[in-house]
Amino acid sequence: MRMNFSTMATAGLLLAALVTTTPRARAFDGNEDGEDDNKSYAIGLWGDLPYSAGQAIGVKNLIADMNAQRLAFTAHDGDLKAGSTVCLDTVYTDALGYFNSLKAPAAFTPGDNDWTDCDRTAGYSSLAQLDHERLLFFNTSYTLGQKKLRQDVQATPLCLGFGGTSVPCVENRRWTYGKVTYVTLNIQGSCNNLCDTLPDAAEFAARNAANIAWMKLAFSEAKKNRSSAVMIISQGNPGFDATDSTRGPVRNATTLAEANAATDGFKEFLLALRAEVAAFAKPVSYVHGDSHYFRVDKPFLNATGQRLENFTRVETFGDNQQNGNNDVNWVKVFVDPNSREVFAYQPQIVPANRTAVPLP
């Protein structure tokens, strides 16, 4: 439980840290050693891990597998634990250890299990936990990892912290690597904090507005910089159509209306995203976790029912223990700024984690 500090002090600490902290590892902007912006590279995506002690062992194997490959950076799309377990300090310190054991820069965006759902345990505050994550994982303008990557930060105090005071949305990041713009957004499962144990409409409204503004700015910067593509990384599955029922909201694909409008924490964002995707006209990849179901598809339609061909949804592997398969694996993305689609996706089944079908 972390309710013994003022949110205003937290905001000040965050802003001061972003200005004054020097990363311990070497940092760089975009491409390493002056590499050509047009050069192809690969990144690693993972999330919704670990949910158990067994998966924690699998995560170490996953990290070793990532470290054995040449990656420009990695990104974890949130959920460091199961939603039903207590938000103990060790959850976050263990995660920090995982991220900093990665050789490549390690980007991260929080998950609902990390903060939104923490109030399922008496005495725990969702916003106190989010404040703790902001201080632990986002106290500089760089990624985590043994090598650091410089990021732009949404430092304007648009979000809410513990006590309801406005604080910087420092978890929202943006960076450019090889002519591609990347952006993280604090978008959550549990109806984006509008359902579950203690819904918080005020917190949602502030963060939702901040997310939309940060997303729009990312597309504006991508256009200004003539980026070849945009990749958005968040936790929650917003639901894109009537078939997306695997823990995601089911909605009308053209109106984007959800059946239960009272707890729809995504429609306003999706409407804004759809407009930006159409206007950008170049490849857009939307990476999320939440549903624990690896997939790459094109579920986004415009208001007249036409598919937005330049939009691809990527859901990373995640906890799948209920089906007897832990799915402690990751997704390798090949990025070629000069190719037509820019992104190519390849699931990586970690050899040391194979149990159902062991290696021959």
Region annotations inferred by a language model:
Residues 1-10:
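Bacterial N-terminal signal peptides that target proteins for export
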Residues 26-91:
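N-terminal active-site segment of His-dependent metallophosphoesterases
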Residues 48, 78-79, 111-112, 235, ...:
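Active-site glycine-centered loops adjacent to acidic/histidine catalytic or metal-binding residues
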Residues 331-360:
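A short C-terminal boundary segment appended to hydrolase-like catalytic domains
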Residues 18-24:
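C-terminal segment of classical bacterial N-terminal signal peptides
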Residues 86, 90-210, 214, 293-296, ...:
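Extended active-site neighborhood of metal-dependent phosphoesterases/phosphodiesterases
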